[in-house]
């Protein structure tokens, strides 16, 4: 993207973060939710590759940097309240660190959370653990 929109006008939380939902651009499948700060959003818009902020590691998380499961960004949309982002991406491989295609594999059924999809790849293969 040649010129970035004004990212300061977005409504970040007290930690300076905004939720970002990644959706497969051609199927509409919701892949994951992660956090972005102004810098990671600027990088995403500039490079066309998803970059998030990892709250657990307290650092930038360039999707696919260790697993190879990159998200190429086709579009970034902002909701009407300016407090949530939607990234339309082309997911290469799996999106979830569990080896599943998306992170939403648990479904409320009969009073508990049931696993509805199996991993497509062993997480140890993804991260070399």
UniProtKB/Swiss-Prot annotation:
Q: Which GO terms describe its cellular component?
A: cytoplasm
Q: How is the cofactor bound?
A: Binds 1 Mg(2+) ion per subunit. Binds 1 zinc ion per subunit.
Q: Which domain of life is it from?
A: Bacteria
What keywords tag this UniProt record? Answer: Amino-acid biosynthesis, Cytoplasm, Histidine biosynthesis, Hydrolase, Magnesium, Metal-binding, Zinc
* Enzyme category, top tier: hydrolase
The annotated subunit structure for this chain is:
Homodimer.
Q: What is this protein called?
A: Phosphoribosyl-AMP cyclohydrolase
The gene behind this protein is hisI
């Amino acid at each position: 993207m040649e010129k970035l929109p004004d990212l300061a006008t977005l409504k970040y939380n007290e930690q300076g973060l905004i939720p970002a939902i990644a959706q497969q651009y051609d199927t509409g499948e919701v892949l994951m939710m992660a956090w972005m700060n102004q810098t990671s959003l600027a990088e995403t818009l500039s490079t066309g590759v998803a970059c998030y902020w990892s709250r657990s590691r307290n650092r930038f998380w360039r999707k696919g940097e260790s697993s190879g499961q990159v998200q190429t960004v086709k579009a970034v949309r902002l909701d009407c309240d300016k407090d949530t982002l939607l990234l339309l991406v082309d997911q290469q491989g799996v999106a979830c660190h569990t080896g599943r295609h998306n992170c939403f594999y648990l479904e409320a059924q009969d009073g508990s959370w049931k696993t509805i999809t199996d991993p497509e790849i062993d997480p140890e293969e993804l991260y070399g653990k």
